[in-house]
Amino acid sequence: MENELPVPHTSSSACATSSTSGASSSSGCNNSSSGGSGRPTGPQISVYSGIPDRQTVQVIQQALHRQPSTAAQYLQQMYAAQQQHLMLQTAALQQQHLSSAQLQSLAAVQQASLVSNRQGSTSGSNVSAQAPAQSSSINLAASPAAAQLLNRAQSVNSAAASGIAQQAVLLGNTSSPALTASQAQMYLRAQMLIFTPTATVATVQPELGTGSPARPPTPAQVQNLTLRTQQTPAAAASGPTPTQPVLPSLALKPTPGGSQPLPTPAQSRNTAQASPAGAKPGIADSVMEPHKKGDGNSSVPGSMEGRAGLSRTVPAVAAHPLIAPAYAQLQPHQLLPQPSSKHLQPQFVIQQQPQPQQQQPPPQQSRPVLQAEPHPQLASVSPSVALQPSSEAHAMPLGPVTPALPLQCPTANLHKPGGSQQCHPPTPDTGPQNGHPEGVPHTPQRRFQHTSAVILQLQPASPPQQCVPDDWKEVAPGEKSVPETRSGPSPHQQAIVTAMPGGLPVPTSPNIQPSPAHETGQGIVHALTDLSSPGMTSGNGNSASSIAGTAPQNGENKPPQAIVKPQILTHVIEGFVIQEGAEPFPVGRSSLLVGNLKKKYAQGFLPEKLPQQDHTTTTDSEMEEPYLQESKEEGAPLKLKCELCGRVDFAYKFKRSKRFCSMACAKRYNVGCTKRVGLFHSDRSKLQKAGAATHNRRRASKASLPPLTKDTKKQPTGTVPLSVTAALQLTHSQEDSSRCSDNSSYEEPLSPISASSSTSRRRQGQRDLELPDMHMRDLVGMGHHFLPSEPTKWNVEDVYEFIRSLPGCQEIAEEFRAQEIDGQALLLLKEDHLMSAMNIKLGPALKIYARISMLKDS
């Protein structure tokens, strides 16, 4: 796809397309100019030429030949990759928004550093030892030298078996200074980490052909990116994402690398890398052709240079010796499917096939390298395969992918047997190129399983550019858990995946994979193609495609996409549609009490939070609308007053209808309403709608109650017991401002039945039954009526009178006087105080404490 994209930068783009069949069929992106000079043909950026808008990010998978024994290290790297993936995801999101021009400027910034590195690397391109030192530096693959440098560095790193060359080579758009070098590096490093489990990955962001010299490898880089492309297949599809260009480069790199590097024994690691690198040169024909034809086979420098030209691509290839074969095969498959979509890729396919062929001759060389880091490389290779299938398969998923799979299978074979060579032997030189389809059935299947295993690793890389965060997290862990995740697709895959992460298992995984691959390989290939195309289609294409590699077989492609989706704002849970808000829920809201608290919240914080809530959840806003009106009518947006006890408190503390401060008040009110007669009932109904009415009602009731008490007290006690109790209660409500006494003042006289609804009613009922004490109570009521309204102002005598007024507490009142308990002390009393200090029994103590609590509340 990227090859097809018009490349404004250099003729290299045209060359890439036109010279697809150029020097090495492996390099679909051969630049006409690069046919001879290979590296200088930096214009090969043509691959990226399509990428300019895509913010091409090349992941140079450094196939550091890590010891398989370092399983723990491998896991750590995977975790680190996951962690960095988060950072990378952020950077990737930012980069996606960056214009290609910005990416190019970034590339230019990095190119400056790369130029120096390249010069050094160009001289030391032949020497892989030089590469490592240079690899550490950020190499802009803008120039072939830089690409070589990266390739060498990666090759060296892989050869050195150093950890992931975390030198994320940010071959960013040379002209895009907009991206900060640190950003690019972070992004690259994160992606590198992603690949790290399989192999050291250097992330190169070759933007357009700013570094035309380096861009020549771009086709190869594109394929390298292919590994990343899976990460960002969708991105590649979109102009900004360099992924797709990357894919071609990956495919291309493997092709030339396969054929060229293998011949060079010294480059055995390089061969692993070189094969990728060679394939990369094949990809970037201009850059790689010389290497393919001359350097690729015999001269390490050539292959190195080819890598350099593909510096990004090569590094990835080098980084993944196994990947190189895998890429060669994988990319061939994808290239075959994508020949129509991308000339580079189709050629890559052929070249990559040759790579295996060429690699076969130097099996020992390749094997050492591959075996040394076979697991990492294998994993990385698989990723590249998976990536390319995903991203490139997107272009021509079904038909081409199957051919690509054969290549992948060979790659898998190579890796499994102990080198890409083995795989290649399975595929004849002509067979791979012409017979991708032939090889597809067997090797593709294995390859595919590898791919699935690899895909997990690659997926992390690809997700970073697009919605990689979730995907990557899953993928990165997947690398470990990939076997399980992938296992869903096929047990063989799972075994392969496990083996690959382990690194040592790789040899066995090859064995496992071949048969499963044969069984499921073809199906996987189609599934992969199908899934890959969806991945490209979807915004989450990167993660989708990477998943596609593994999930295609499972048919998990869509679910993984859903999982990958970073911003899932709507959920359906048990039939309820739940929408997430872009911001955290307000502190005041409790999401558990849907009805009550939402109403409370609507009234309490609606004025402040309503706009936010409307945006937050449709459900909330819908539920709150009715209560909004209610709260407006009440006119108490922040604070509400309980209609029963008159307590003023924050609206969110009020229950349900916002009219009562507690469930007790609501129950008492409801019971009272059923028994109440006209005056209060109509008054209450009005109070529901007007907050001011509440205060008025309270005042009116208080004003009207004292006369009642005086009148009732004048009446004979025996004749009007209920009236007396009512009067007492009303006086309590006035003086104590106790909501419970207030409630009973309204309800008790009219409805003795309601006594059971509350503690105060029970006490009232007890009082009604205690007719013998009625006279005393009446006297107490007379004295009590004159108590100060605020309990804190009571003196000892006031407290004494208050306690005497309580049922059954006449004798205890003396104890209060003896203890000199005034109003303040009374409010501080607890049951244990009463029981321990005054030797009061539990029953009376609880009653007294309940009355004291009512005083406090009032």
UniProtKB/Swiss-Prot annotation:
Superkingdom to which the source organism belongs: Eukaryota
Modified residues (Phosphoserine): S621, S751
Signal peptide per UniProt: none
GO molecular function, one term: chromatin binding
Cellular component per GO, a single term: PcG protein complex
Residue stretches making up the SAM domain: 794-858
Subcellular location: Nucleus
Record field: compositional bias (Polar residues): 265-274, 379-388
Chain span(s) of sequence motif HD1: 558-587
Stretches with biased composition (Basic and acidic residues): 473-483
Zinc finger (FCS-type): 633-667
Position(s), cross-link Glycyl lysine isopeptide (Lys-Gly) (interchain with G-Cter in SUMO2): K598, K600, K632, K702, K847
Record's comment describing the protein's domains: HD1 motif interacts with SAM domain of PHC1.
Protein name: Polyhomeotic-like protein 2
